[in-house]
Amino acid sequence: VVEDWKQSKHSQKGVDCAVCHGDKHYSKETVDKAEVPRPERCGYCHGTQVKQFKDGKHAKAWSSLKAMPTFHMQPMALMDGMKGCGGCHKIGIKTDDEVKELRKQGGQFGVASCDSCHTRHLFSKKEAQQPQACQTCHMGIDHPQWEMYSSSKHGVRYLLKQNGVLPERAAAPTCQSCHMTGGNHGVRTAWGFVAVRLPLPEDKKWAADRTTILKGLGALDPSGKETARLGVLKELDVFRTTQEDWQKERDRMFANCRQCHSPNFARGELEKSDRMIREADRLLAEAIEIVAGLYRDKILAKSQYYAYPYPDLLAFHDAPTSIEQKLYLMFLEHRMRTFQGSFHANPDYALWYGWSKMVSDITEIRKMAADLRNGKKGKRR
């Protein structure tokens, strides 16, 4: 810890331990007196960055985690213990009470948010500017952006620059080039995490498909009426809820693409990715409707954890039946890869890890539903 700090800009500028941790901890007997730094403490010197951060989606990561309908069912070591979801979602802003509770459970380390990217105790700006700073969290089943980026031409060129193969001035964007342009810490995207938005599109078929997906997310009830969960999702900024907000983020990304590409190319690539979402939505909506039909016809019994007799995509791996387990993977793994791979310039991910898997999923879901309707016993987890 001390050696890291000695090599940091903080050390050079005279920002010592007491500036961040207070002056009440001065021996091993007073460890409990050390203050846990929060973004507000960083804001004393880095006010602009903290304000930007609070306007972005990273600041809402902890609240988003807590809002998931089956959060309370998970092993606490995974959540508050930071060994699962909490390990990345800890970047989000936490209340004083939440920090106190985390401290009781030994999960107080790394709750400062800023240190998720500027790791302690170097707190290096240069570190946080590298794409590898994003790798720990933006990888894996539902958001493999690192895998997509690092094997795309964007990523390959930058990694070759890091290795000295390409010249220093070679064009090669990082995650930060596109998502944190100019060092802006207010990270947001037009389509959000789950690639839905409001208002509904003019395309009637796509509008119907998106309505079905919103029902699956619990934002609408089975009859199409808005639910309390929609209010929560809006508050957490999970997706854009006005055309103006969506357009603002699209224009920002378009301007980023224009730093290297022509307007026609940049616009065309973004619009092709939009169309990939539309195609993926068609398959996912059909799958949701198939499972919803099983609930409607009482072939599946409503889970005690569900608000309605309707599949809940946000139940994730706690989905109660085998067919819903397949649906959850179709949504969280394969649809994500279809549209994320497209936006991250990785055709292999968009096709073989995404779209191809969705086609297989819908084929299996149709067969599983037919078996259930033909009287074969459905497996409940």
Feature roles, as predicted:
Residues 2-12, 29-82, 91-379:
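Primarily the internal scaffold of c-type cytochrome electron-transfer domains
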